[in-house]
UniProtKB/Swiss-Prot annotation:
Sulfotransferase that utilizes 3'-phospho-5'-adenylyl sulfate (PAPS) as sulfonate donor to catalyze the sulfate conjugation of thyroxine. Involved in the metabolism of thyroxine. The keyword Transcription regulation does not apply. One of its GO terms (biological process) is sulfation. Its EC number is 2.8.2.n2. 3'-phosphoadenylyl sulfate binds at residues 65-70, 140, 148, 203, 237-242, 259-261. Pfam families: Sulfotransfer_1. Keywords: Cytoplasm, Transferase. InterPro entries: P-loop_NTPase, Sulfotransferase_dom. Gene3D superfamilies: P-loop containing nucleotide triphosphate hydrolases. This is Sulfotransferase 6B1. The gene is SULT6B1. It is found in: Cytoplasm, Cytosol.
Length: 303
């Protein structure tokens, strides 16, 4: 991640704000969804409507803890492979995070720009669709996502912690966590995953065959790489490789962003009733949908 100082500077500022923030005061609500006051403001959301996307922007959309930092790294490496230029991060890459002037500054950034986001499809600026930017949508099974989100809150020293996993799970299922409900996010994106400029990525598929996943991402973005280049990026993008470099790339929060990356870690925390509750929620929200099938829920969340 090229301009480490800017990336880390933003994270450090957010962590500093978090020190003084009680969990009960961590969120503000904008258009019905809770966001962390340490990273987002209503003024920034209002300014977001004026953001002008470009046709060669690369949008990475995901619910928190679904692998966006992983994909960010992979796309940065792909850009480097085809251009021989390290991708620079003059701003924190999550589109909705930062001050309201950032979109004005971003007009001067060279193409292609990587724009990460945790927003619902219908909360994104219209210019992304009008100008046909490429959108990678990353999903991870909801049980592992929940456990990863809990550990992020409770392991990072300066972020307000939950009293217990049970407390976090209750709030998660009510959508009272940063960026709201996983299932609301999923329902909102479900109808838009088969568009010409949209590519669905499953975290678990990447874990199973990283090189194949990188090749698919490269082809979707119109990057033509050799097998050797794909293999090189794959080696540099394993979870272990990224965790080893995480302090350099993401600062103090790095080791917590890349904690385990395992598939099935949910089995260490979910109780039987919680399992049933999430299985019912999945059935209610996503059974019979295109996204429901893509998530391979039975393989990764049952048994």
């Amino acid at each position: 991640m090229a301009d480490k100082s800017k990336f880390i500077e933003y994270i450090d500022e957010a962590l500093e704000k978090s020190k003084e923030t009680a969990l009960s005061h961590l969120f503000f609500t904008y258009q019905g969804i809770p966001y962390p006051i340490t990273m987002c403001t209503s003024e920034t959301f209002q300014a977001l409507d004026t953001f002008e996307a470009r046709h060669d922007d690369i949008v990475l959309a995901s619910y928190p803890k679904c692998g966006s930092n992983w994909i960010l790294h992979i796309v940065s490496e792909l850009i480097y492979a085809v251009s021989k230029k390290k991708y620079e991060y003059p701003e924190f890459p999550v589109l909705e995070c930062g001050d309201s002037e950032k979109y004005q500054r971003m007009k001067g950034f060279p193409s292609p720009r990587i724009l990460a986001t945790h927003l619902h499809y219908d909360k994104l600026p219209g210019s992304i669709f009008k100008n046909k930017a490429k959108i990678l949508v990353i999903f991870r099974n909801p049980k592992d996502t929940a456990v990863s989100f809990f550990h992020f809150h409770n392991d990072v020293p300066d972020i307000p912690s939950y009293g217990s996993w049970d407390e976090f799970f209750r709030q998660l299922m009510k959508g009272q966590v940063s960026w709201g409900s996983y299932f609301d996010f999923a329902i909102n994106w479900n109808k838009h995953l088969d568009g010409d400029n949209v590519k669905f990525i499953l975290y678990e598929d990447l874990k199973e065959n990283l090189a194949a996943g990188i090749k698919q991402i490269a082809e979707f973005l119109g990057f033509f790489l050799t097998g050797e280049q794909i293999q090189t990026i794959s080696v540099q993008s394993t979870f272990q490789a990224m965790r080893a470099k995480s302090q350099d790339t993401h600062g103090a929060v790095g080791p917590f962003l890349f904690r385990k990356g395992e598939v099935g870690d949910w089995k260490n925390l979910f109780g039987e009733i919680q399992n049933q509750e999430m299985d019912e929620k999945f059935k209610e929200c996503l059974a019979g949908t295109s996204l429901g099938a893509k998530l391979k829920y039975e393989s990764y969340c049952q048994g």
